[in-house]
């Protein structure tokens, strides 16, 4: 039993270090853009509380440590997934934010890989449906979550030159439609998980009710440009993930 807890600890350490390293590189590449946005202007680099060289060293150190730690203490598959997370986030998603609005879809890929790191770290087959179910759960969850953020901060994103689907969507109509579409994808995914025997049917029923409840601000939205409904929908996405993961942990115990 103790060995399992140590394995969990090493997996968490390696995954966290890889994520922090990716975030450091992201902020290095976006110093000037972050300085233009109120929500990011107080980060260490744009606020000049940290030097570029120090951030570069921290980024490389954390990213390298995370991948190497996973390879040494967990397994090669976990290290490969961590390296893929860093590569996609830093070299594809980050620059893509400047030239194509589909960057949110691409950015959701590295954001959804960590559950796969945990899956293979625990000894699961990297091709197993259970691991990929968790990947798609995180993937589809991120989209409504970040659509709401990007709409609420759309003026800042436009000022910084980021190409987001919310750009120019003053009424919020397009963002609302996208929010609903990918929320339906979430519901469909969990129904598929139940239908294939990953967990009992009550999980799918409870999940569907939860998603519909949390979508209420968007479903009643009149595309009037009001911020309150979108903010409520965003807060709902924050509530959604821990509730669902706790429910899945209970169903799988």
Residue ranges and their predicted role:
Residues 2-6, 108-150, 154-155, 159, ...:
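Functional transmembrane core segments of multi-pass inner-membrane proteins
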Residues 16-24, 87-95, 136-154, 187, ...:
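Transmembrane alpha-helical segments that form the membrane-embedded catalytic/substrate-channel core
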Residues 31, 39-79, 170-194:
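Multi-pass membrane catalytic core of lipid/isoprenoid biosynthesis enzymes
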Residues 116-126, 185-193, 240-253:
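Hydrophobic alpha-helical transmembrane segments in multi-pass integral membrane proteins
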Residues 174, 215-243:
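Interfacial loop-to-transmembrane junctions
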């Amino acid at each position: 039993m103790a060995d399992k807890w140590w394995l969990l600890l090493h997996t968490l350490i390696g995954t966290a270090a890889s994520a922090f390293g990716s975030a450091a590189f992201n902020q290095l590449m976006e110093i000037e853009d972050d300085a233009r946005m109120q929500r990011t202007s107080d980060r260490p680099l744009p606020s000049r509380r940290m030097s570029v060289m120090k951030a570069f060293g921290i980024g490389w150190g954390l990213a390298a440590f995370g991948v190497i730690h996973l390879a040494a203490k967990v397994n090669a598959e976990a290290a490969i997934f961590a390296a893929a997370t860093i590569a996609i986030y830093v070299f594809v998603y980050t620059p893509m934010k400047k030239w194509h609005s589909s960057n949110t879809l691409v950015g959701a890929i590295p954001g959804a890989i960590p559950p796969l790191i945990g899956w293979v770290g625990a000894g699961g087959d990297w091709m197993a449906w259970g691991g990929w179910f968790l990947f798609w759960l995180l993937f589809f969850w991120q989209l409504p979550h970040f659509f709401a953020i990007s709409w609420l901060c759309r003026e800042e994103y436009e000022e910084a030159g980021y190409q987001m689907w919310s750009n120019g969507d003053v009424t919020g109509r397009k963002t609302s439609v996208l929010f609903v579409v990918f929320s339906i994808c979430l519901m469909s995914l969990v129904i598929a998980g139940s239908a294939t025997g990953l967990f009992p049917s009550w999980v799918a029923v409870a999940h569907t009710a939860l998603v519909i409840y949390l979508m209420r601000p968007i479903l009643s939205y009149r595309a009037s440009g009001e911020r309150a409904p979108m903010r409520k929908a965003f807060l709902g996405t924050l509530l959604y993930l821990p509730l669902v993961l706790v429910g899945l942990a209970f169903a799988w115990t």
